[in-house]
Curated annotation (Swiss-Prot):
Upper lineage: Bacteria, Bacillati, Bacillota, Bacilli, Lactobacillales
Keyword Coiled coil in record: no
An example Gene Ontology molecular-function term: ATP binding
Catalytic residues as annotated in Swiss-Prot or TrEMBL: D55
Protein name in UniProt: NAD kinase
Localization in the cell: Cytoplasm
Any Pfam family: NAD_kinase
Amino acid sequence: MTQMNFTDKIKVAIIANGKYQSKRLTAKLFAILRNDDRFYLTKKNPDIVITIGGDGMLLSAFHMYEKCLDHVRFVGIHTGHLGFYTDYRDFEVDKLLENLHSDKGEKASYPILKVTATLADGRQLTSRALNEATIRRIEKTMVADVVINKVHFERFRGDGISVSTPTGSTAYNKSLGGAVLHPTIEALQLTEISSLNNRVFRTLGSSIIVPKKDKIEIVPKRLGSYVLSIDNKTYTHRNVAKIEYEIDRKKISFVSTPSHTSFWERVKDAFIGDFDS
């Protein structure tokens, strides 16, 4: 019997949350893959990242490996209800292993968000978001110009602004009244957070869908502290000069799953459920 070379093996990382059910599943999966000659368990530069928990766990794993997006693929196991990023439930480990054994490198890829914040002192901070990025002002009302492709669109007054990806459209964006976009649509969505609209101040008041090649700029008009959120991370900065949002050249890729639950089925399951008409 010929032993597989290390370089021939599929490098797999397992990332899980701290819940009891997730820990049990991690131990089971780790034991199986450790004794399988086709796989090599490592968290360093993996080919496949398996997340165990929920969509929040996959968000964390995305940020852990966002510098490896050119070659890494993700696959999620949900230990609760089926999520938007997780294809397997906790009782479907055998199905996952079967699919990994027959895997030929096929993937499903979706756009992500590139965010560049320029501070008043000239420093630039660049991040990537899988779901959304928001900006809020800590003190008083946020006043900011919204610029799309170098064209001044509106002066916003309110609590803040959210820019989401298609996959993130079902998250915070939806709770703000934004539209749900299919993840294969390469576009960004700008949604206002509690905008002021009266006889004096006016904004569009509805979400804006921006195509792939367009860039959104938010230019704050007041000095002070701002809270910037990138998915499940938050940062506080003073005197933000502008923030630019655009679709990143890289994408997130998932292991192609034969029994993949369709996006619209997930939307129905998450927000509508089954009912008798």
